[in-house]
């Protein structure tokens, strides 16, 4: 059963494959914003995946995310999520992201439950 308070955590190493330069979102060898978005989304859906009924999944419907600091190759970015509200099919998460030096981003992500 999905209830507010469910938490998740995922980490990813910053490598040449997920930099702004490689992903086409900039010219620098730092963790790309698209990679930050993907990490936030993955952390949220994975935190609730085990509680979903068979044939049920989630899709992202809203994302408000700040990418506030660069993370260079060789460091790790960690995302922590908390399910803050369940409103019918809508799941609302608070996300915070950090690396070894401190905060690098945060915001709100919403998922919608769907039946496949």
Enumerate the language-model features and the residues they cover.
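Catalytic strand-loop segment that frames the active site of acyl-thioester-processing enzymes
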Residues: 1-32
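Intrinsic-disorder/low-complexity, polar/charged segments enriched in Ser/Thr/Lys/Arg/Asp/Glu/Gln
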Residues: 3-9, 62, 76-78, 90-92, ...
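Generic structural detector for well-ordered beta-strands
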Residues: 11-14, 66, 110-112
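Short, residue-level hotspots on alpha-helical faces of the histone-fold
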Residues: 38-42, 46
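Hydrophobic beta-strand-centered segment that forms part of the acyl-chain substrate-binding groove
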Residues: 45-78
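Hydrophobic beta-sheet segments that form the core/acyl-binding groove
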Residues: 65-100
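C-terminal structural segments of small proteins and small subunits
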Residues: 97-107, 111
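Conserved small/polar residues in nucleotide/adenosyl-binding loops
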Residues: 114-116
